């Protein structure tokens, strides 16, 4: 069994989840990724921390979950999922607020939020073995943030072998027996979402013991799940869309044809797992599964940590590089609006610069999306690697041709870099006391020369949190750039509570390929043999030239720095997310340690 080593930070704060199962109102819990099914990242119930008090944050405790980790895992995966927080859990020691997190080694831990002491922990054994050796793209580990059903006193989690476990919040005892297989073993999945008893997640990056039941066969004459140009009169042509786009990269997050070898594993490498969304109806004792495939192989996967976001009685998700041909079921670089439970396509938006995105490995799916209502209008925001931020009409995402946004602004990545720039995390949103709607994006690299923010909080060459306000101009909603934060190297998904934005500078190494000139400038030593000029960097290389994670608290309306953890965190993190709940803030890093911060005296 693989062991992981991660680090989690907890900062004291109150949480809210306003549409997760029975949870509503001004709750102080955090039962799912992003705090609610909409993935807003907004803690509506926090009162302890404020702009006036957050500067007094101090380290309260830290707890390590696992002791060992494979380098292949730690350089390509989050080592602990975003912590979840439930109040009033009736443990054997009495009612407690409990913090839950899942490690890459299949260990689910429940910690006392007051002390960090372990209440219970369970490590789940594999029922099958992976057929490919691990690497930093396909880590063969648990990756999906669990979800809590407070009404049933159950936390649901996905083990690496694809089994869905439901365990008791108070004791860790199994409540879902036997655990059903939900996803393909050792596939890459993202945060679970639970709505009306139906569980959702995404499957991407081609990892796992394929093939997938019901996966479509590639169309004749195509490669890697690509498509042929639509015939005259088909749906895409009638909608005014371009022909299907060929030559899509073979995986998300890196250029075509350059994925690390998947290894021999235990026999011949399995076929790539076709990218898809998946739902399981937990209300039905048979637990039926629905799947919606976005390609026939590796391309077009969804890999936002938010997974599927709930909005306007539907589910929103963005896909990555790949062929776009809706009549053939190929959905590269597309924001999809899906029906609950059945996952049928209700609407979609595909950026008009699709060819540029695919040619430069600018995954639209690297960012995230969320929906909200503004002055009686249902809106959606989204962004990806190319740094363009979109504001869409939820009732018609891309207009008649599915390619025309209501509003867009180029906010970052002028260089069109496939790594180190653009949006690599989910947005967040909140409404302030003046009923103003704000939206925040984590942008890697400097702001675009095309965008002018009203306020800058310093040079942001490595990355920043960007704040936009939704306003109406000429009867049409638009995004107005209000402020850009201090430099963050690099930012991840921010969260909001009581007028304060919480953001991290991850400290990670964002380089990926040996072809990147920065790789040779940094890694080539005088007198040493020449470094490779092709291929993807190794896990060991990606683990070098890192710094350490820093937590910041910023004024949500100005970006002014209110707090910095400075050197309190001595490790870096990757694909991490902040949790805000019940007077604490939680952040994970690669050594599977949970840090808890709260107000000092």
Model-derived features: positions:
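Bacterial N-terminal signal peptides
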Residues: 5-15
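N-terminal secretory signal peptides that target proteins for export/translocation
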Residues: 1-2
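Noncatalytic, solvent-exposed loop/strand surfaces
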Residues: 20-601
């Amino acid at each position: 069994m693989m062991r992981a080593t991660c680090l989690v930070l907890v900062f004291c704060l109150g949480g809210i989840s306003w549409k997760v199962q029975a949870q509503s109102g001004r709750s102080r819990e955090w039962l799912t990724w992003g705090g609610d099914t909409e993935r807003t990242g907004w803690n509506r119930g926090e009162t302890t921390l404020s702009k006036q008090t957050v500067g007094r944050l101090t380290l309260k405790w830290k707890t390590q979950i696992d002791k060992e980790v494979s380098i292949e895992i730690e350089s390509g995966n989050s080592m602990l999922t975003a912590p979840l927080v439930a109040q009033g859990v009736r443990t054997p020691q009495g009612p407690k607020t409990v913090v839950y997190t899942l490690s890459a080694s299949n260990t689910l831990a429940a910690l006392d939020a007051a002390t960090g002491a372990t209440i219970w922990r369970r490590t789940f054994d594999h029922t099958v073995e992976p057929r490919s050796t691990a690497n930093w793209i396909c880590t063969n580990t648990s990756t999906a943030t669990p979800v809590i059903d407070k009404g049933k006193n159950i936390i649901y989690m996905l083990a690496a072998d694809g089994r869905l476990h439901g365990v008791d919040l108070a004791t860790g005892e199994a409540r879902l027996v036997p655990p059903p297989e939900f996803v393909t073993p050792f596939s890459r999945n993202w945060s679970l979402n639970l709505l009306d008893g139906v569980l959702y997640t995404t499957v991407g990056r081609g990892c796992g013991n394929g093939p997938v039941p019901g996966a479509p066969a590639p169309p004749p004459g195509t490669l890697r799940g690509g498509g042929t140009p639509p015939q005259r009169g088909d749906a895409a042509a009638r909608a005014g869309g371009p022909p299907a786009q060929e030559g899509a990269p073979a995986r998300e997050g890196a250029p075509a044809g350059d994925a690390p070898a998947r290894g021999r594993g235990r026999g011949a490498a399995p076929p790539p797992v076709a990218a898809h969304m998946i739902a399981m109806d937990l209300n039905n004792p048979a637990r039926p599964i629905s799947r919606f495939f976005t390609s026939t192989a590796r391309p077009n996967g969804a890999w936002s940590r938010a997974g599927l976001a709930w909005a306007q009685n539907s589910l929103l998700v963005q896909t990555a590089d790949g062929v776009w041909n809706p009549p053939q079921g190929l959905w590269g670089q597309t924001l999809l609006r899906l029906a609950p439970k059945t996952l049928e396509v209700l609407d979609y938006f595909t950026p008009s610069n699709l060819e540029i995105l695919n040619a430069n490995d600018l995954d639209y799916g690297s960012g995230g999306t969320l929906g909200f209502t503004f002055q009686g209008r249902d809106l959606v925001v989204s962004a990806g690697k190319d740094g363009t931020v979109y504001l869409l009409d939820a009732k018609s995402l891309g207009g008649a041709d599915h390619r025309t946004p209501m509003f867009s602004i180029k906010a970052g990545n002028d260089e069109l870099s496939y790594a180190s720039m653009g949006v690599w995390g989910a947005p967040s949103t909140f409404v302030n006391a003046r009923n103003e709607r704000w939206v925040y994006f984590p942008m890697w690299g400097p702001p675009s020369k095309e965008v002018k923010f009203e306020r800058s909080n310093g040079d942001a060459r490595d990355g920043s949190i960007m704040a936009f306000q939704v306003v109406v101009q000429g009867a049409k909603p638009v995004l107005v750039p209000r402020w850009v934060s201090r430099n963050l190297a690099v930012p991840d998904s921010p969260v909001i509570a009581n007028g304060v934005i919480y953001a991290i500078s991850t400290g990670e190494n964002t380089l990926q390929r040996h072809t990147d000139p920065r790789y040779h400038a940094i890694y080539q030593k005088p007198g040493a043999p020449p470094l490779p000029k092709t291929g993807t960097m190794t896990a060991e290389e990606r683990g070098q030239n890192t710094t350490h994670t820093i937590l910041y608290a910023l004024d949500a309306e100005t970006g002014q720095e209110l707090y910095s953890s400075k050197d309190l965190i001595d490790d870096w993190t990757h694909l991490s997310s902040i949790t805000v709940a019940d007077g604490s803030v939680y952040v994970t890093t690669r050594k599977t340690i949970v840090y808890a911060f709260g107000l000092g005296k």
